Amino acid sequence: MNRMSNTVIGFLNILTLISSIVLLGSALWMGRSKTTCEHFLQKPLLILGLAILILSVAGLVGACCDVAWVLWVYLFFMVFIIVALMGLTLFGFIVTSHSGGVVVDGRVYKEFKLEAYHPWLKTRVVDTNYWVTIKTCLLGSVTCSKLALWTPLDYLQKDLSPLQSGCCKPPTSCVYNTDTVIQQDPDCYRWNNAATVLCYDCDTCRAGVLETVRRDWHKLSLVNVIVVIFLIAVYCVGCCAFKNAKRPQHYGFPYGRYGMSKSRPGWEQSWSRWWHGRDRY
């Protein structure tokens, strides 16, 4: 029974070790993939995956080798990981709670408005240096090339991703075949048919990027809830493993040299021994 918690914590840390490798792989894939330009989640995933990887190795060493100080360090940093993950999850739900999607009459797809998103997200894409990085990534992807052969009927019948809706075409409300000057969305004037321009500098494109990030971050927050519950369970079992590892170091053989407890005689046993032995003198 004493080794049960050590076995369980070892098994659970193998699972967390595998999970950390998956997280690190996902983060590296985000950085190299040509089909996604999401850099918001790459660094958090790298940091989280690396932290869980190190903790998992420490937990395995401490549980399998009964090293109390390693388990103490493991549990100490596990608290910070759990608290940080809970904070990140809560922040993720707050930031991704609102979508900027607007239904377009007669269309299957939606268009997205930049002003509808959380201010923290907007400050990222409004930053010129950051947007140059995103724009370069979009130009190197196949996001808009898929729409090159679309007909006007396709735009009426087919759905578009947030990036395609915001970056690959002008807003649906734009009117270009008129001689009169009318007030239009500023993005209508940013649009250009050139493949390297399109609507990459439009606010709708920035909104499309934010919508893509919002959807993925919301899914990640849901997964984080499960991860937090799992880590709390691992922490509780780890506390039991720490007690088991600490006991033999501080008390030698707490259950006797051969694993059996040896109780001290009580007062009634001492009194009975004295009473029966007094006639010998």
UniProtKB/Swiss-Prot annotation:
It is a multi-pass membrane protein. It comes from the Eukaryota. Its main location: membrane. One of its GO terms (cellular component) is membrane. It is found in: Membrane. The chain crosses the membrane at residues 8-28, 45-65, 75-95, 222-242. The keyword Membrane applies. Disulfide bonds: none annotated. Pfam families: Tetraspanin. GO terms for biological process: auxin-activated signaling pathway; organ growth. Residues 1-7, 66-74, 243-281 are cytoplasmic. May be involved in the regulation of cell differentiation. PANTHER family: TETRASPANIN-8-RELATED. Belongs to the tetraspanin (TM4SF) family. This is Tetraspanin-5. It comes from Arabidopsis thaliana. The lineage of its organism: Eukaryota, Viridiplantae, Streptophyta, Embryophyta, Tracheophyta.
